[in-house]
Amino acid sequence: MTTLGEATDMRKRLKTASPLCQVHKTNGTLNPLLFQEEFAEKKNNEYETSQPYQHILLKDVCDDRFLSQALRELETHVTLSFKETDLFKVLQSVDLASLDTAEGRKKCTNLTKLRDALYSDTFRRAVERMTGCPPLDARVDCSCNVYPHGGHLLCHDDVIGTRCISYILYLSDNQEEWTVNDGGALELYPVSKLVHATPSVHPTKKILPLWNTMILFRVQAGQSFHAVQEVFAKYKSRVSISGWYHVMTHSSSATRNASAQALVHGMNAYTETTHTNTEVKLANTCTFMDTKFSPTFGREDRVFLREWLNDAYLDMSGMLQLNQQLDKEGIIVLGDFLNENIAKIVREKIKLSAANGSGCLDESSSTRWVTCGPPHIRRFLRYCHKETKQTKQDHRAELSEQSMDLPSVLTAICDRVFHSSAFRKWMASVIGAHLRVTQGQVRCFRPGLDYTLAIQNPTSASEKFSLNLCFVNDFGNDDEKSWSSGDVGGYLCHMKTKPFEKMSTPAEVYTEENEEKVSSVDATFNTLTIIKEDENIVNFIKYISKSAPSCRWDIISNATRSA
């Protein structure tokens, strides 16, 4: 637990700011301009025509001096809790409704005054006029949120219960201008034209968290998708009071929790965006490989895989131990999975890509990269390729060729190892069953952009297993520490959750009672993770911070136990 003052100890001391101009000056709370009919009509016109969905931005919401005093009370008297899930990383206060005690009102006089003003009948009526929304309830639902360096909130639509209007009042330091380079912008996502109630992979509007401004937008299922961009600034924090105005009456449709339900129950609306920014709906993201092969892992298979894999994992007794561990723990992590000869080639390609600036790319870098979405579930790049054929007898010489860039090398490993009958036999021995194996994919997670969120698996009669072979630049001591600290994300998180039908929001998988069921695998070069899946298991790749040493590249595949 920490206070805002402790969380932002690097920021400058606030000076007394200039008040609103005399015509708008109030007795220390909200700008009287907000209550004028002409202003409300103007803002309503802006609201109705705004894109990508209805929203408005208000400036000079409060008297500057008053807001500075409220901020000082936040810094001094309000306790913040650090919260991190697959969806966010933030310092958050309790609901500010809890300040309704004698001590709370005494210590936070201006803060409670601000809260009361925001939920007053007068201001709620003003919000109704500006947005055209139904009558709003007096229910207080707000908190203080502080996003320090690396803080973020990924794409979601805010739809829970009777929420009608979302608002954010910014209290970020007014003594140093907030710029685009600082990050922390509110990102608004348009809805895909291809897939109903699904956000496009990229936002089309970004709003900076400027001092004494307020954003309001209508909460709409499958429409109001937004995110808080990662805060890139090292010595600034994005500070806000945010919350919701609720409708007075409860409708059956109001309980729908669109983006959260997609995370919990999964969805088929996966999308990809090509380099031409054309979205493509994927009816089925998995292609099963032909599995007609002898299930016995034999000498020829071992000889073949020794050219690629660490020999320590090809011993029969070692494979038996892996099988027992997977059966007991549900997860195994194999470091130094590729042999040193192959790993050296990949390592050099990663260094080369960093040196020539292609280490962290986007879909415009190559016609072969596509962005996978939708962003309220996932965002990363997938490398599209046709299966390659070996052109040289010595595959090490071929992989080392200058014409082979990093994605080409990873593609070759995917094709020649993951798609080989020898590897499928090895997998069958480790898992202990005949398998159907999906075609592997090469992915790239870019710093400051990419992630997958926790999606609960649907119930299945067949046992399923996921494979993930990870590569990152952790070659220097500082790089290794950065990844292992977890501060820059990129790790694979593996969790046992509540029973399928009882889990209602993404954050529920992180309740304190489930903390002991959470495990993570650091983003580490040349590490294979195999996970046994079921309907009570969720996995995700944590959002990768812009300050990460490199992209995270991986090769993934899935296997299903045959009947």
Feature names for model-found ranges:
Residues G132-D141, G432-V442:
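Short, surface-exposed acidic
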Residues A7-A17, H24-L30, F35, E46-Q51, ...:
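PAPS-dependent sulfotransferase catalytic core
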Residues S68, T162-I165:
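Non-catalytic, well-ordered alpha-helical scaffold segments
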Residues T2-L20, N145, G150-G151, D158-R163, ...:
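Catalytic core of Fe(II)/2-oxoglutarate
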Residues D64, D121, R125, I165, ...:
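A structural signal for well-ordered alpha-helical segments within the folded catalytic domains
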Residues S408, A412-G432, T438-I455:
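C-terminal structural cap/anchor segments
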Residues F35-M130, L309-D311, M319-W426:
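Non-heme Fe(II)/2-oxoglutarate
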Residues T26-N27, V78-L80, P135, Q175-V180:
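Proline-centered turn/helix-capping motifs that create local helix->coil transitions or kinks
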